[in-house]
């Protein structure tokens, strides 16, 4: 089954301290967002890639898309102030896909095998996310004091892509807009719907999100390892 992927790309990534949209930062002489788009462009089930962008950066994105040709159609829509609003605007641009993926533009290392499993899970169960078991000890802290050590066995660090039946994700965003709910990811919006469950597809620890300057060092190491440098 084919899918369309919505990629929120309007954020400025202040923690990266790059002074610009972090998706324009180059890894191995290619912008991060192009690395991410290439993954989906090469995936046979991807029908369309929708970028929710800052209108002020439209020309920058258009210029990149002209330089780097893709076989899969790419659509640009204006995003919102919050990530959730950007995804919603991208979702409105979905045309005829029964399955919709949402993916962080700053995660260029997602693998096709994980996308395959994720799409399969969304078809069968409605909603699924890529995640990895938490490796560190997690503690709840209040005003600098440890209040509780959380049992690690049931904790998973959720990544993207996240995949949903189009109808479910649309209903979740509409409900969030009506109620004013602001979630940290799209799965948290679906969790607000009565009777809807979200399922886990185990991912890979290399599927990092580029958030801080240190992440760029890790990203380069991952790329070197994958290319055998």
UniProtKB/Swiss-Prot annotation:
- Would the keyword Nucleus be found if you checked this record's keyword annotation? no
Tell me the keywords, alphabetical order. Isoprene biosynthesis, Nucleotidyltransferase, Transferase
Site annotation Transition state stabilizer: residues: 15, 22
Tell me which InterPro entries the record gives. Answer: IspD, IspD/TarI, IspD/TarI_cytidylyltransf_bact, ISPD_synthase_CS, Nucleotide-diphossugar_trans
**GO-annotated molecular function:** 2-C-methyl-D-erythritol 4-phosphate cytidylyltransferase activity
**Family, similarity comment:** Belongs to the IspD/TarI cytidylyltransferase family. IspD subfamily.
Q: What is this protein's name?
A: 2-C-methyl-D-erythritol 4-phosphate cytidylyltransferase
Q: Which organism does this record belong to?
A: Bacillus pumilus (strain SAFR-032)
């Amino acid at each position: 089954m084919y899918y369309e992927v919505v990629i929120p790309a309007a954020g400025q990534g202040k923690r990266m301290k790059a002074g610009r949209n972090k998706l324009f930062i180059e890894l191995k002489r290619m912008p991060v967002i192009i690395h991410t788009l290439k993954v989906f462009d090469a995936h046979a089930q991807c029908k369309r890639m929708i970028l929710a962008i800052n209108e002020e950066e439209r020309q920058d994105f258009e210029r990149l898309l002209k330089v780097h040709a893709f076989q899969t159609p790419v659509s640009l829509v204006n995003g919102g102030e919050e990530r959730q609003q950007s995804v919603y605007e991208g979702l409105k641009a979905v045309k005829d896909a029964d399955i919709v993926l949402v993916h962080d533009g700053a995660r260029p290392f997602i693998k096709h095998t994980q996308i395959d499993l994720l799409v399969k899970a969304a078809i069968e169960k409605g909603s699924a996310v890529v995640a990895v078991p938490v490796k560190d000890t997690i503690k709840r802290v209040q005003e600098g004091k440890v209040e509780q050590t959380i049992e690690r066995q049931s904790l998973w660090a959720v990544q993207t892509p996240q995949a949903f039946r189009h109808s479910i994700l649309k209903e979740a965003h509409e409900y969030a807009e009506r109620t004013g709910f602001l979630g940290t990811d799209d799965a948290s919006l679906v969790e607000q719907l009565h009777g809807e469950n979200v399922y886990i597809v185990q991912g890979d620890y290399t599927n990092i999100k580029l958030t801080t300057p240190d992440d760029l060092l890790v990203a380069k190491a991952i790329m070197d390892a994958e290319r055998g440098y």
